[in-house]
Amino acid sequence: RSLVDAHVCVDPRISVSEGHRIAEVTRKRVLESHSSVSDVLVHIDVEDDLDHDSKSQNTPDRSDLIRQLAPVLSQLPEPQRVVLHYLGGRVEAEVYLSRQDFGDSAAGRGVEQAIGRYLAENPLVSSLAINHRRQIFPVRD
């Protein structure tokens, strides 16, 4: 009997739950198609592990990054959520606001300028996206 350790590279924009689903499907397929395999451990990665591990060792954690983003975030209404992507030794931030909180185009231009200055001064953050949601529909049970 064998134990299998597999690494599957995926698009960095998939959700955590989709990554988990890919891992479960991969595990099931290997077990069903190889009777000599007793168990499979599937790692879902967005980058090559060796490259990712060496580049991401010096990136700050979420709380530190949110503090670093404070100069920009303080100019916005309270975000509904902030999503951080650790890619290539840098960080991409997605900030989600409701549409009604951020409809003024003059305010939008001011924030765009602040984001441009922030990115120029902070090379760790490779991009910062501000997303507007018109409405969040409730989850049905």
Describe each region flagged by the PLM.
Residues R1-D141:
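Peripheral (non-transmembrane) domains and long loops of multi-pass membrane proteins
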